[in-house]
UniProtKB/Swiss-Prot annotation:
Its EC number is 5.4.99.-. PANTHER family: PSEUDOURIDINE SYNTHASE FAMILY PROTEIN-RELATED (PTHR47683), RIBOSOMAL LARGE SUBUNIT PSEUDOURIDINE SYNTHASE B (PTHR47683:SF3). One of its GO terms (molecular function) is RNA binding. This is Uncharacterized RNA pseudouridine synthase RC0807. Signal peptide: none annotated. Coiled coil: none annotated. It holds the Pfam family S4. Keywords: Isomerase, RNA-binding. InterPro entries: PsdUridine_s_RsuA/RluB/E/F_cat, PsdUridine_synth_cat_dom_sf, PsdUridine_synth_RsuA/RluA, PsdUridine_synth_RsuA/RluB/E/F, PsdUridine_synth_RsuA/RluB_CS, RsuA_PseudoU_synthase, S4_RNA-bd, S4_RNA-bd_sf. The active site is at 102 (nucleophile). Residues 2-69 form the S4 RNA-binding domain. One of its GO terms (biological process) is enzyme-directed rRNA pseudouridine synthesis.
Length: 230
């Protein structure tokens, strides 16, 4: 048995908080009976309707790889009315992101219809590998010779797994950065602290999933068998 609001959220209909509001508003039925209490426990074998629509994907957590373009923020609602990732995903059911990428970053963003699946991926104990390719202006030796392990910046400790120089020319350098637990704007802050200005940041891998040949704005769904093995 599970909380009704949780089942609705995991089916990708809306957030758990919004599901609770729909229940209180009388918009949810279980086996034809209107339910008004968000704390009601139900079984996934029950027929659940939300605003007259039967939920039919309760049993199936789904996962997509999305190439997030630069210029979109990873949120459902933005008080500044900036363009969001989810406004562009008109071909998908309601999904949530696993982690996020900031406005000026691009690359692999995992999307799912399951809150439980998202939490499993995001737990620090999961130790999922995140790989980024970063272009920056400045001298690479400053960063590469620095002790970036357990680096404290403005009272926050950062601990990237590795930073490797890929190539450089007279104007900029490309690096590969590997994280196992990302913090807000971690890469940009470490590079800035070492005198480098990041002007391109692309996530190419999250866990076992890679961006492959996707172009900005493209997405693909992960096969269920692959998902079960991760």
């Amino acid at each position: 048995m599970h909380r009704l609001a949780k089942i609705i959220s995991n089916a990708g209909v809306c957030s758990r908080r919004d599901a609770e509001k729909l229940i209180v508003a009388g918009q949810v039925k279980v086996d034809g009976i209107t339910i008004l209490s968000p704390t009601t426990n139900v079984d996934i074998s029950n027929q659940i309707e939300v605003s007259g629509t039967l939920i039919n994907n309760i049993h199936k957590p789904r996962l997509w790889i999305y190439y997030k373009p630069v210029g979109l923020i990873t949120t459902h609602k933005d008080p500044l009315s900036r363009k969001t990732v989810f406004e562009q995903l008109t071909g998908l059911p309601r999904v949530i992101s696993i982690g996020r990428l900031d406005l000026n970053s691009e690359g692999l963003l995992l999307l799912t219809n399951s809150g439980d699946l998202a939490r499993q991926f995001e737990l620090p104990s999961s130790r999922l590998k995140r790989v980024y390719h970063v272009r920056a202006y400045g001298k690479s030796d400053i960063l590469l010779k620095s002790n970036y392990k357990n680096l404290e910046i403005d009272g926050i400790f950062y601990n990237p797994h590795s930073i490797k120089l890929l190539k450089q020319n007279k104007t900029n350098c490309w690096f590969e950065v590997v994280l196992f637990e990302g913090k807000n704007r971690e890469i940009r802050r470490i590079f800035e602290y070492c005198g480098l200005k990041v002007n391109k940041l692309i996530r190419i891998q999250y866990g076992s999933f890679t961006i492959d040949n996707l172009k900005p704005g493209d997405y693909k769904e992960i096969n269920n068998k692959i998902l079960e093995n991760n």
